[in-house]
Amino acid sequence: MALDFLAGCAGGVAGVIVGHPFDIVKVRLQVQSTEKPQYRGTLHCFQSIIKQESVLGLYKGLGSPLMGLTFINALVFGVQGNTLRALGQDSPLNQFLAGAAAGAIQCVICCPMELAKTRLQLQAVGPARTYKGSLDCLVQIYRHEGLRGINRGMVSTLLRETPSFGVYFLTYDVMTRAMGCEPGDRLLVPKLLLAGGTSGITSWLSTYPMDVVKSRLQADGLQGTPRYRGIVDCMRQSYQAEGWQVFTRGLASTLLRAFPVNAATFATVTVVLTYTRGEEAQVDSEAALGTSPTPAGSALAQPSSL
C-alpha cells in the first residue's frame, strides 16, 4: 500500500512538471482583458512568456501544486477507494459517485493551492513581485483577508472538481474495461496511457466553463478593486463583455496539457512499481492504478492530474 501511494505521488509529480507550462498559459489567457489583450492565442502566449520571463516563467507557481500533491493524492486514492467499497458494487454509477466524492473532498487542499498558483502566475516579474513563493503568497492572503481569502473560489472549485472527477473515473473505468486491460497484456501500459489521457480530456470538457469562472474569481482584485460579487455575477459580467467564447478561453492549452500529463503520470507509476517490486510490478501496477482484471474486479483509480 505504501509503495502504491509512493508510485502515485511520483506519477503526480511527473504530471505536474509536464503540465505546468500549459496551465500557466491557460490561466493567463483566461484572465486577460479583451479590451487590451496581451496574447493572441496559446502559441503566442508561450512565446511571449519565454521571451519576457525565460523558460522559468513557464514554471511560476510550481511550488504550490507540488506542495499539495501528496495530500491530494492521499485523499483521492483513499476517498475514491473507500467510497466505492462502501457503495458495495463496482458499477459505472458508483464509479462516478466515488470519483465525485474524491473530487469534492480534495477541494480543501486544491482550492488554496490553486489560489496561490494563480496569484503567482499572474504577478509581475522583477522587483515588482508581490509574493516570494507559494507559502508566502498564502501567508500574505491570510494576513490581509483571513480564512475567507484563503478559500476564495471554493464554491466554484467544488462545482468544477466534483462532477469532473466523477466523469474522470467513470471514463477511465469504461475505457480500461472496453480495451481489456488484463495483467500480462504486452500492450497494458499503452492502453492505460490512452485511457488516462482520454479521461483527462473528457473530465476537463465536462466542467471547463466553471474553471474559467474559478480562475477569474481567484485573480479578482489582484490589480485593483474587485469586479465580481460571486459566481453568478462573474458569469454574467464575463458573458456580457466577451460573449459565450469567454467560457472556452484557454481550452486549447488545457486539452493539449491533459493528455501528456496523464501519460506522464501513468508511465511514472509503472516505472516506479517496476523498480521497487520487480516481478510483482505488473500485477501491483494494476492494483495501484485500480485496473480490474475482470468486470467484477477492483475499482479503477489513478493519481490526481491537478
From Swiss-Prot:
Q: Does the keyword Transport apply?
A: yes
What does the record note about the induction of this protein? By partial hepactectomy and fasting.
Which regions span the lipid bilayer?
2-22, 61-81, 96-116, 153-172, 187-207, 255-275
Query: Subcellular localization, per the record?
Result: Mitochondrion inner membrane
- Keyword terms of this UniProt record: Amino-acid transport, Membrane, Mitochondrion, Mitochondrion inner membrane, Repeat, Transmembrane, Transmembrane helix, Transport
Ranges occupied by Solcar repeats: 2-86, 90-178, 190-275
- Free-text function comment from the UniProt entry: Mitochondrial transporter of arginine, lysine, homoarginine, methylarginine. Transports with a much lesser extent, ornithine and histidine. Does not transport carnitine nor acylcarnitines. Functions by both counter-exchange and uniport mechanisms. Plays a physiological role in the import of basic amino acids into mitochondria for mitochondrial protein synthesis and amino acid degradation.
Q: Which family does it belong to?
A: Belongs to the mitochondrial carrier (TC 2.A.29) family.
* Identification of the protein by name: Mitochondrial basic amino acids transporter
The encoding gene is: Slc25a29
